[in-house]
């Protein structure tokens, strides 16, 4: 039997220093590198931390300092790499990377844009296909005029390789964990305002962003300094997940919510707002608990009820972990990417 040739992927991201899409790009790129059915080259904005993560895991890396469509060197370098590397698939992440890819085909590469939010579709006019990480995003893209046959929904995965099965004894201290960017969309302020009504709990907030000083003001205002701690973002999120008893995602807007899947994989019960990705993927009292967006008192009530109902908590943890294994594991998602790439390569060759 003749083996199928490897799929050659040129994987491109500009990306911020931190973020959910950036974190998943790193995971997926490393997974592609481990897959014996894929050959890969990546192009990233020059970022010391990202480069450090890839130094032992990815062989072919190109870096661009100023990742912008108005930078002629950026477009020229990408065109040169395509011409020399001859990829089957050019996978561009988010707005910036998708806007700087060439206007014309260089080696009959198939261009696939990857969206993780409700971005402006005009940035993806050079793409042949799109991948969204939620079914709602797929509907959004199609509503903007995209052919349903050219939009694929593939969710994110989380890796289990850093998950420590041995929980810390600190679990007994009733620690609530919240992780993410310090941005209005994340609604971390709602969780801080809930803490005066949850006197038996401590809160760990992990992240970075523009609202840190405002959170610190709220913490002092409600005299929560001894129970609420802010930590800088860490790539080893298992360190925090293994210390908490409940994970809360209070977002006002959240396209997917990687952290929810992280909680499932770590066997931590999750409490989420009833919006966006978390509101869609979590089944109330089955794989998590949902509360009304921006409703502090509903959040307090749901946390108290979950904590007091040990049977419900066990049920949620077991169900959520099973969903993670079935639908959000690395093996399942990488296989989906592979089958999608094979399908569109075959379709474009006919």
Specify the residue positions occupied by each region the protein language model found.
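N-terminal strand-loop element at the rim of the active site
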Residues: 11-74, 150-153, 210
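A conserved mid-protein helix/loop that constitutes part of the nucleotide-sugar donor-binding site
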Residues: 19-30, 174, 178-197, 210-216, ...
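Short His-centered aromatic/hydrophobic patch
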Residues: 70-74, 92-98, 115
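Carbohydrate-associated surface elements
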Residues: 136, 157
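Aromatic "clamp/platform" in nucleotide-sugar-dependent glycosyltransferases that forms part
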Residues: 233, 252
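Short hydrophobic beta-strand element within catalytic cores of glycosyltransferases
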Residues: 269-272, 282
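Conserved acidic donor-binding segment of nucleotide-sugar-dependent glycosyltransferases
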Residues: 284-285, 289-296, 305-310
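A short, well-ordered alpha-helix in the C-terminal region of glycosyltransferases
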Residues: 298, 305, 312-327, 333-339
